[in-house]
Amino acid sequence: MNVKTLHDKLIQYMARCLNLEENSFVEEYGGTLQVISRFNFYIPCLYIDQIRTSSKHADSAAMTFLLQDKELEGLEFEKDNEWFKAPVLPHAIFVNVGDQMEIMSNGIFKSAIHRVVPNPEKERISLPLFCGPAQHKEIGPLKALITKDQPAIYKSVKNYNEIFFRYHPTGIRPITTVKMT
């Protein structure tokens, strides 16, 4: 199964979970899936007092597929202000919901806050694939999810990645900048 097929199946299942037409998210994408891959190489940190975690963040993409190291922990998720280690599952693909899916689902699906903690003794690798609509595509909460009782939480935005990379380094969570006021 290729990445596009896996991605499309997952967002179709997610639409069904919300009692939406199966292709609701696919249509919001405008028929184009953008996939950006990155190879992460974390060097060991020999001195425990020098170990630095990556800053906590959510991914800008709608969904991230992550192949993580087969032997070493490092990925942690935040829930209720507590950090939980992702288990090492060789050959497993972790799936994270990102900010763009939170926007399109009008906040029903939450983007996963996470960080990486390097190992003090061994190098670690991971390969994330960030999947979402093409950058030029405007996205917003799906109309079927907006009602009088549940108004839009997020504005429609074009090129969310640009917003993400403008605010992420400042410590401001980028998705908060596109919330309705």
Residue ranges, per PLM feature:
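C-terminal flanking tails of non-heme Fe-dependent oxygenases
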Residues: 1-181
